[in-house]
Amino acid sequence: PYTTLFRSAALPPLVRDGKVFAEPAPYDDPMSFYESDPDVRVSRWLQSVWRGRGRFSPSDFRLAFAVLVDGEAVGMQDLIAEKFDSCGTFASFSWLSTDVRGRGLGTEMRSALLHLAFAGLGASEAGSDAFVDNIGSNKVSEALGYERNGVDWDIRRGEPGRIQRWRLTRSVWETRRRNDIELSGVEDFCTFLDHH
């Protein structure tokens, strides 16, 4: 797979068609993906993407990447940084279209994001979380060397659910670092960060 900064025309058809959803429900509230009206679902989702872009600083930013397979958009992978300039920590959020799940793409796209954050941006630690019954996401974290980091509670579709938290340090990532992931445009982004 290939990831590129999100362009608004690539992914809305998947959101509109409900291909981002799964059972058990994987997203916490409020989540635009739970909207029953397809147009409202797309509109609210795009608003959240643009909100993330609008709150940008060297400390706090959200980078949204479209995931492409053979040139076709199949999902999204976000890098979410808070206090990045002082702590070097970040989290991730992702989704895949229902018709490409179970092929290892979740692991590949998270691997690409980790490579960007650690090798490209100099991050020190990655965090992730998922509802305990989100087997796919939790398996990806475990496969990539994340360590369990406690449990918490969150709300999904109005009901409480247990969350599994994960953390991956730079030193652990280094032992699993891949040499087949290429980064492009990172120096320009780092320059942009330095000037804001």
Predicted stretch roles:
Residues P1-D99, L116, G120, D154-H196:
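GNAT-family acyltransferases
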Residues A10, M109, G136:
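Charged catalytic carboxylate motif
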Residues G71, G104, N134:
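Conserved G/P- and acidic residue-centered "switch" motifs that form tight phosphate/ATP-binding loops
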Residues W95-L96, G102-A117, K139-A143:
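Conserved acetyl-CoA-binding loop-helix of GNAT-fold acetyltransferases
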Residues A119-D129:
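Conserved GNAT acetyl-CoA-binding A-motif
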Residues G127-D129, G145-I163:
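Conserved catalytic-core motifs of GNAT/GCN5-like acyltransferases
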Residues S128-N138:
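Conserved beta-strand-loop-alpha-helix junction that forms the acyl-donor binding cleft
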Residues G136-V140, L144-E147, S171:
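Surface-exposed, gly/pro-biased binding rims or lids
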